């Protein structure tokens, strides 16, 4: 019987992007043949600076993850706090008014919370 997983990964430090993206990749690889997954990544704090700090490889990995259906939400409060204009983000990244509110909303919908 196919199982449908719902996960929300929370990232708030720019230096943990590789870990979070690795976790997403490993999870999807582990369940690929048997189950379905809906994955959200919510970025707040310094994690949003990935778009400003010349981390092209991580940004490519984020874009690649969207091809498997992973959705990325960036916190507008964190963007403002880090002087990053929302318009500078690529189309495959969504913004939310507050990252913490999005996390709570997803948990209310049954998503499992993961903070690597």
Predicted regions and their residues:
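Short glycine-rich or small-residue beta-strand-to-loop segments that form or flank ligand, phosphate
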Residues: 6-12, 42-44
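Short, glycine-rich nucleotide/cofactor-binding loops
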Residues: 9-21, 50-51
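Solvent-exposed loop/turn segments at secondary-structure junctions
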Residues: 14-15, 47-48, 78-81
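Histidine-anchored nucleotide/phosphate-binding helix
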Residues: 18-33
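Short helix-capping segments at alpha-helix termini
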Residues: 31-35, 65-66
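Short internal beta-strands
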Residues: 39-44, 72-76
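Short, conserved secondary-structure transition motifs
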Residues: 43-51
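A cross-taxonomic marker for long C-terminal extensions/tails that follow the last structured domain
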Residues: 52-116
């Amino acid at each position: 019987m196919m199982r449908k997983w719902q996960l929300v990964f929370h990232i708030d430090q720019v230096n943990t992007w590789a870990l979070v993206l690795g976790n997403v990749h490993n999870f999807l690889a582990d369940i690929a043949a048997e189950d379905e997954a809906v994955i959200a990544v919510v970025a707040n704090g310094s994690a949003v600076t990935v778009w400003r700090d010349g981390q092209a490889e991580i940004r490519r990995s984020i874009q690649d993850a969207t091809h498997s259906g992973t959705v990325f939400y960036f916190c507008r409060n964190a963007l403002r706090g880090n002087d990053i204009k929302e318009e500078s983000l690529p189309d495959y990244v969504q913004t939310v008014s507050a990252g913490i509110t999005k996390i709570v909303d997803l948990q209310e919908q049954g998503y499992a919370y993961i903070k690597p």
